[in-house]
């Protein structure tokens, strides 16, 4: 298999994981997209010189009936993504379209100035950056990984009232945890985790994102 074939296969797997991640966050993703075969991926996204057209990989997805609750996924070209891409290609499009959440998938770590730009932009937007290597496989598909459910504000309030606790009294999970990143956890949110004991009975625990 050639290097180009390897790259196509890698990006095919990355795209599949991204779509699964969006689905697991509650966004509407077509089954036909989730189940796209590699051959179909090549026909759809590799029309020039057997190379993936990353611009065509762009995703726009909605969560539930609210059209304002939308997310964009960007796949910038080039091995190293810097400030111009983050500010001009990502942030400007999100602002123009009034989309407040976005994911940027990059081949390798973004530059230090780009990280600073993302941090600054995240005061107004939510921009997540994933490296392709993090998405080649879906970490939630491992049989030992527990199922996560991110509580909305109403469910969180009900939980805290039921147990008469403050959210800060719950066990914590870092927003940098790989599973927290997969589910897009923000600081202050609560996640419900389904676990199984030795008898295969399910039980639930809760974590407060910090």
Curated annotation (Swiss-Prot):
Keywords: Nucleus. GO terms for biological process: DNA-templated transcription. It is found in: Nucleus. It holds the Pfam family RNA_pol_Rpb5_C. One of its GO terms (molecular function) is DNA binding. The keyword Nucleus applies. Its main location: nucleus. GO terms for cellular component: nucleus. Belongs to the archaeal Rpo5/eukaryotic RPB5 RNA polymerase subunit family. This is DNA-directed RNA polymerase subunit 5-like protein 1.
């Amino acid at each position: 298999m050639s290097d180009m074939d390897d790259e196509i296969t890698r990006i095919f797997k990355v795209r599949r994981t991204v779509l699964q991640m969006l689905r697991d966050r509650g966004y509407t993703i077509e089954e036909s997209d989730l189940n796209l075969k590699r051959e179909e991926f090549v026909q759809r996204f590799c029309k020039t010189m057997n190379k993936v057209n990353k611009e065509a990989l762009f995703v726009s997805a909605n969560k539930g009936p609210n059209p304002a609750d939308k997310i964009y996924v960007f796949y910038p070209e080039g091995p190293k993504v810097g400030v111009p891409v983050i500010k001009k290609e990502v942030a400007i499009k999100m602002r123009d379209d009034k989309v407040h959440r976005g994911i940027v998938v990059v081949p390798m770590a973004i530059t230090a100035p780009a990280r600073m730009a993302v941090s600054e932009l995240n005061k107004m937007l939510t921009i997540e950056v994933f490296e392709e290597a993090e998405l080649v496989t879906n970490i939630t598909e491992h049989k030992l990984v527990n199922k996560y459910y991110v509580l909305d504000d109403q469910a969180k309030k009900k939980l805290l009232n039921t147990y008469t606790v403050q959210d800060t009294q719950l066990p914590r999970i870092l927003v940098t945890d790989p599973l927290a990143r997969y589910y897009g956890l923000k600081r202050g949110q609560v996640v419900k985790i389904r676990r199984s004991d030795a008898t295969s009975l399910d039980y639930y625990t809760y974590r407060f994102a910090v």
